[in-house]
């Protein structure tokens, strides 16, 4: 979207389940044929062949710069020790590495922490806040002795691009691989992922957020050696979201009941 802000909207592709780019065969999960897709539909359905076709036309140097902007190969300040996510593709890379890399495979490695931060930025209109574990510390007399004040860490994308991604992420839930998260209890948006694992069962991914009107919770799930993200990671995310909102509803209605009793 940054490299081709006008033409990406016209993208169209006929998915037949697999394709060959730079002598590398790329398949959609279980060779599913998605048929005619635009960018939004390809995203919602996790169409690998559409994205590898689109990604193979990107300027590799600009692509690497974008990933640097998104904090790959960097230490992210945090209270706990976390590894760096790894992105190796550059203008000197073998052409065979491009197809795998543009769909998040190959030598690309990403931590759940990093994935969650990127989703936080998207949900926050492109702005990433500095992450921390402890909100504040209170003394024995209940006074605050230390407090972490929210501060901006980085602007990762424009508000316009973030809004577009929010719409696409929402469609993953309403009409895509994250459909099992579509519920009346809350609204959700996110992205599933299925990372290949050298002939073993794939790693299942899901990262997303809830309450799309005013996002309040980001969840990232990685289940190793299992299979599709929609089958193994999404159900876990749903349990987390459900627990969060069910508990909040209990607290809310409990407070209303107590208030009503005190008024009487």
Where on the chain are the PLM-derived regions?
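Beta-lactam-recognizing serine transpeptidase/beta-lactamase-like catalytic domain environment
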Residues: 1-223, 260-264
């Amino acid at each position: 979207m940054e490299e081709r802000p006008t033409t990406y909207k016209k993208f169209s592709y006929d998915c037949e389940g697999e394709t060959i780019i730079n002598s590398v065969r790329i398949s959609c999960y279980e060779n599913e044929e998605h048929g005619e897709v635009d960018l939004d539909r390809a995203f919602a359905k996790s169409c690998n062949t559409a994205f590898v076709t689109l990604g193979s036309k990107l300027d590799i140097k600009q692509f690497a710069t974008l990933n640097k902007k998104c904090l790959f190969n960097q230490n992210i300040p945090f209270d706990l020790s976390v590894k760096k996510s790894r992105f190796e593709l550059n203008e000197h890379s073998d052409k065979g590495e491009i197809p795998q890399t543009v769909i998040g495979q190959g030598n690309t490695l990403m931590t759940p922490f990093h994935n969650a931060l990127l989703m936080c930025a998207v949900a926050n209109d492109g702005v990433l806040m500095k992450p921390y574990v402890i909100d504040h510390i209170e003394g024995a007399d209940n006074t605050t002795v230390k407090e972490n004040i929210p501060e901006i860490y980085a602007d990762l994308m424009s508000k316009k691009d973030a809004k577009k991604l929010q719409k696409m992420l929402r469609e993953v839930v309403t009409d895509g691989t994250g459909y099992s998260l579509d519920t009346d209890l809350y609204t959700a948006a996110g992205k599933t992922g299925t990372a290949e694992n050298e002939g073993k069962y794939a790693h299942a991914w899901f990262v997303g957020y809830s309450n799309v009107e005013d996002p309040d919770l980001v969840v990232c799930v990685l289940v190793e050696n299992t299979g599709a993200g929609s089958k193994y990671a999404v159900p876990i995310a749903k349990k987390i979201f459900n627990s969060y909102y069910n508990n909040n509803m209990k607290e809310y209605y409990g407070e209303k009941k107590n208030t009503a009793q005190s008024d009487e």
